[in-house]
């Protein structure tokens, strides 16, 4: 298993609404400076912040499956399907853009914080489907706790969110002195963003490597293996993991660096 750790300097950045919304982008759009341009069907990952409030006006989407996952504050959504919704901390909004939809969004703080993540299904097939939108509150997501680790399943498995693209997503909190182990099978990639605190990651039997808050970790597996994440210090660790296939059996959108 191969491990790569990318600090914020190797991630992209962006802003909206005159700087009211700022973004750190582990996987950005073309030209936004991220060292990682895509990971299989994981096309885009932005970590947005708004100290007070920020607005992004109506704009179109097609084909992609777009998840908004709220860390803090509130996310407002409106679209051309006639939908209006608000989601708070721990909640999520999912757009499956299909043949096309327009939407607008607002982040409301103080200190609003969320992820927007794009997954790429087979675009040709997706364009034949009607667009859909769904919202989920924090209490709808299952959590399991064991030996100082809390794992919330956001996409896949027991979660209410299932998408067409092959992907799983988890929000993991690790107490000081505890560790979380994630198994990876061949042709699988794990993308990890350290949301709160730092820690150590070891891939299989390799020596553990340290990472800091806001670092982006990428692990690729060519055979069965496991990655271990341990908290460092006295404040614990929170990170979000997304697992996708390293390669898919359909053509992907040609994304430039």
Q: Which residues are covered by each model-predicted region?
A:
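Jelly-roll (double-stranded beta-helix
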Residues: 1-257
